[in-house]
Amino acid sequence: VPRWIQPSEEGVEIGALATGEGGITDVGDDVSARHAHVWCDDQNVWYVEDLSSTNGTVVVNGATNVCTQVEPGRSVQLNPGDELKLGESTTYAILLGAL
């Protein structure tokens, strides 16, 4: 099921008990209650930050297949074609698009 995230500096939270407007809770059993935060800066660059999840967050570069572990408190850029992996059970493909 595609999830559209409006470009904003507030962004959205992803997790089993994600809160806030647009929170994404359609995740696997190994995803933390508040797992990750995704947002867009004022230059339209997208980022993800791990929220001290139990099972980790990984960005897989769509062009190189290089995996980057997202450390809590550190933001990692997201690009179209990348995959965002939350734990072992949940993967999102990063696409650029409009409603």
What do these predicted ranges mean?
Residues 4-88:
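Forkhead-associated
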Residues 92-99:
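Short, compositionally biased
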